[in-house]
Amino acid sequence: MSTAPGVIKLLGEHAVVYGKLSIAAAITLYAHAYSTKRGSDFAIKLKDFGKEVKLTSEELDNIYASYNKKKSFEEYAKLGYGVALPYATIASIMARNSSLDGLEIEISSDIPVQKGYASSAACSLAFALELAKQIGANIDSKILEVAREGDKVIHKSEGAGKIDINTSFYGGIVSYSSEMGARKENIDVHLNIFIVDTGPKKSTAETVGHVRELYEKDRQGTERILNEIDACSRKGIELLKTGDKRGFGEIMYRNQELLNMLGVSSEGLELVVKKAKENNLLGAKLSGGGGGGIAIVLADDDAETKVFSDLGFEVKKVSIDYEGAK
């Protein structure tokens, strides 16, 4: 069995698209991949979707060829296989040097989907890791790149999964920028993290596109906001290293104000942040693409977050997973 944790964005989302620093954390919600030997073909079983796909070696070859000659992810999706296509893509890459015949990989997850937890990255990574173990492949950076191919297919974007896959793999708190790449920070701090689900969210592609439009209309003004988000990320790392939770929470509040200025917040997210401030909680902000979905809240005590459940929001308490995928 292989597991990979979900991921939340502590600071810096959206700005990371423009080369700025982003901070993410692996959390104690997991995707799982189990393997069994059965039959003659390779099989992918998606437990949460009630779907199973069997693939011959010839079909895997065709998927691999189609992926490499695709003109767009939208065109590639027409190949078929539905929600199994990302995993079939990963398998087709790993089948280049090893036979997958007779192997079945089942994927399940306790990470909510389409909320901002990087569930797709965790599922792709757990699947790739379990395949690697079964065929005797090295567990190294190449596996991360293969797992990213699955996340790219899910999000239909070449840029998908860079920080999510790395954070899920390494665990703990990971910083990322396009210039630096991913780096696991030497931080071991206990944070009481509460995830508040504000409801449906816009797709990440939609909110990223909105910021792109804003950037094209007012490059100077938008760049100023993005630079301040970058400064929040850099200051936030230093505060976490010293264990200054109150200071880090204030940075979260400021980061949220800047994200709202970019137009990627929502009425529900703003309500959560407002109530967090009114109740003197340490910090709160959206996590991920925004436009709805989850807010992350730092609090000293569980009872302090009752205000959110009283508003009708679902609240989950999570911790940082420092072990990463395994």
Language-model features, listed with the residues they occupy:
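DPxDG-like acidic metal-binding loop motif
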Residues: L29, Y117-D140
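Short pre-catalytic strand/loop immediately N-terminal to key active-site residues, enriched for Gly-Thr
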Residues: S109-K115, L282-A284
